[in-house]
Amino acid sequence: VFHRNMQRDMDTQVRLAQQEATETSMSELDIYLSTLMAKTDVLFVNDEFASLLSAQPVTLSEQIHASHQMRALMDYAMFNLRYAEVPATTYRGGSAYGKLYLLHPNVYIDNLGIFDFADIADEPFVRRLNEHDEVFSWSRLDLKGAGQYLHFNRWMLDAAKTQRMALLQVRIPLAKIEAVLMSKLTPYQLTAFYLS
């Protein structure tokens, strides 16, 4: 009985310590993302998700999903690509499909080339994307030899409302987000780190 009580007390202490660490990380993440968002114009924030982020550890998933600032950052990346910090957008004409990648240089190479988003901003599917308010979804994507990424989709319905199309896509290095969550850097330093 003594050993069981001791183990229970230890488990409680560990759980409380983990909870405190999670709350601290959540605060740091929001501070960091608030700093980043302060220099942007967020067009809108949609709180609906098609599915929860699937990632380990669970606390990381919960923190990212709970952060309205993270969702705002996704909106910024998707719809307000007027800033040099967003390095590249790829587009395949005619198939209503586009990709936006926030990656380290040379991690992902797209054979379709890299284009300035401003060059395709007037394409019909981009205009429609900005005019509709549909559903966001998260999923986790593992790339062999290239690390792990959070994979973010922007979904919308087609004109006939009969099928969904993944029009834009963001991949962010999981290790970079984890580093942000655990970092003791100032928000300014975190912003510089993320944008690097």
Please name every model-derived segment.
Residues V1-P57:
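Juxtamembrane extracytoplasmic/periplasmic/luminal helical "stalk" adjacent to the first N-terminal
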Residues F79-A84, T89-I172, A179:
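Extracytoplasmic/periplasmic ligand-binding sensor regions of membrane-associated signaling proteins
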Residues Q13, S25, D47, Q56, ...:
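Alpha-helix boundary/capping residues
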Residues Q69-L81, M165-S196:
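Solvent-exposed, extracytoplasmic
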Residues Q18, L33, D47-L73, M182-T186, ...:
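Extracytoplasmic/periplasmic helical hairpin
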Residues S25-M26, V58-I64, G113-D119, L167:
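Second-shell loop/turn segments in exported
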Residues D41, P87, K99, T191-F193:
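Conserved beta-strand cores of small sensory beta-sandwich domains that regulate signal transduction
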Residues Q18, L36, M70, G94-A96, ...:
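Generic hydrophobic, aliphatic-rich segments that mediate packing or membrane embedding
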